Amino acid sequence: MANIKQQKKRNKTNEKRRLQNVSFKSSVKTVVKQVKTAVANADKQKALALLSVAYKKFDKGVSKRVYHANFSARNKSDLQKLVNTL
């Protein structure tokens, strides 16, 4: 446990951000799974709609500094390749 007052404050904000990041990452994973399920079911319209949602979430994650830009680009590319197989 920290003894310095400012570090105690930082610990609170760090925990708050950590929980927000975990929640955000979970929502991104859910959308990615939905895209993969739509591709498995050969539902191109649904896959394309969910793909745009996934792109938006990945870009938002980069701007919020939850994800590194390369991680986001790699995942978006992989999802696009998957949807292009339809």
From Swiss-Prot:
Q: What does this protein do?
A: Binds directly to 16S ribosomal RNA.
Q: Family, per the entry?
A: Belongs to the bacterial ribosomal protein bS20 family.
Alphabetically list the UniProt keywords: Ribonucleoprotein, Ribosomal protein, RNA-binding, rRNA-binding
- A GO term, aspect molecular function: small ribosomal subunit rRNA binding
GO BP terms: namely: translation
Indicate the segments annotated as coiled coil, or none if absent. Answer: none
For this protein, the record's SUPFAM superfamilies field holds: Ribosomal protein S20
User: One matching Pfam family, short form?
Assistant: Ribosomal_S20p
Disordered: where is this region?
A: 1-21
Q: Under which name does UniProt file this protein? A: Small ribosomal subunit protein bS20
Q: Show the ranges annotated as biased composition (Basic residues).
A: 1-11
Give the CC-aspect GO terms.
Answer: cytosol; small ribosomal subunit
